[in-house]
Amino acid sequence: MNRYRRFLEDKGYDVSKQWAEFSERVTYRKFIQNEIIVSPGEKNANIYILETGCIRYFTVNDGKEFTHDILEAPSAFASMFGIDANEISTVNIQALTDSDVYILKPDDAEYLNTKYPGFRQIGDRSFTEFGKNRILQSGKIKMMSPKERYLDFLENRPGLANLIPQYIIASYLGITPESLSRIRKRLYKKQ
């Protein structure tokens, strides 16, 4: 979990007091590529720490997948509406690559929140930042042409273009796989 600790410290969080106990309370799990981590309808209040790999949030409507977000390590994630132990997930969370993940159970998170007041602040700020970034990205995408969306994706997520399937990128950008294929062909012809 060293990558995630450095990530938090780079953001200005002091995790030195609670890190040892935090590390003892998480469990490690390796998710293989395409494995579903959380499914819709599942009660899941776990907090996941993505140490290596890449995951996506997606839903399925009338047999069609809609990718809502893609996260790269290091980061933390949870079911969007499954943070409360009584709430039910409305999304799939899937490992897009083999991913090393640490899982913090709700009881352990509550214990750490009580013992270390700063721990809750880290979680609250992290999930607020995640939500804010998602809203900004969603708004930005609506204002761009499909070509601009793809160019923005290449600029801001350069490692993902060759790492994950193109149909997932197309879904994330809100365009069809065929449109993405045409855009890519035009861009590569210009090079």
Regions found by a protein language model. Give the residues of each.
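Cyclic nucleotide-binding regulatory module and flanking cytosolic helices
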Residues: 1-28, 82
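Short beta-strand segments in beta-sandwich/barrel cores
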Residues: 27, 54-58, 100-101
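Short phosphate-coordinating micro-motif centered on Lys-Gly-acidic
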Residues: 37-42
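Short acidic-glycine-tyrosine-enriched beta hairpin
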Residues: 61-77
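Ligand-binding loop in jelly-roll beta-barrel domains
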Residues: 65, 84-107
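A small-molecule sensor/coupling module
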Residues: 89, 108-145, 149
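Phosphate-/nucleic-acid-contacting segments
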Residues: 144-191
